[in-house]
């Protein structure tokens, strides 16, 4: 049996319009670092919850910096190439430091390594249902502890306007070429603004 907590918070992301490349850094920061700290019943007594939040904050900051550098150098195609190398390396370093698996997951993944487990898929579907009902993603977290002491933390990632350059329904030819070159099994295009892209995740081993 598992006990599952949905954690709500009051951290709100700013409304974003269509932005020039110069404003890309701040938008990515908001998309990657919108984390919550309000307690759910019993959840805050587990130090792994705070560890999960901190690890994702650090992961998001490092990934944001790498993507921003790529975007500044060569727009979306360069950012895609940088992310393909940087994201796994950053996740591996965070995982080693935390003692848990840090990364991202999505039902429509770009990298198959990020495919969700059955439990994660259920949580992602719940996030999607809540978004469709009008709830803000800023209010959502998922914390699930197994009978064996393992745990899963998820935090949703939602498509913002700037994300559409690499994940939208219409891509620039050079962007599509970069995706096709680096991701043979890409499933992460065709999104519209406001849809669930996936989630940050931390998976803790059994105790």
Language-model features: where?
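The canonical Cys-X-X-Cys-His
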Residues: 160-170
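Extracytoplasmic c-type cytochrome modules immediately beyond a signal peptide or single-pass transmembrane anchor
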Residues: 43-159, 174-207
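Conserved long hydrophobic alpha-helices within structured protein cores
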Residues: 28, 169-170, 174
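Bacterial N-terminal signal peptides
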Residues: 26-36
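Bacterial N-terminal signal peptides that target proteins for export
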Residues: 5-28
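Sec/Tat signal peptide C-region and signal peptidase I cleavage site
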Residues: 38-42
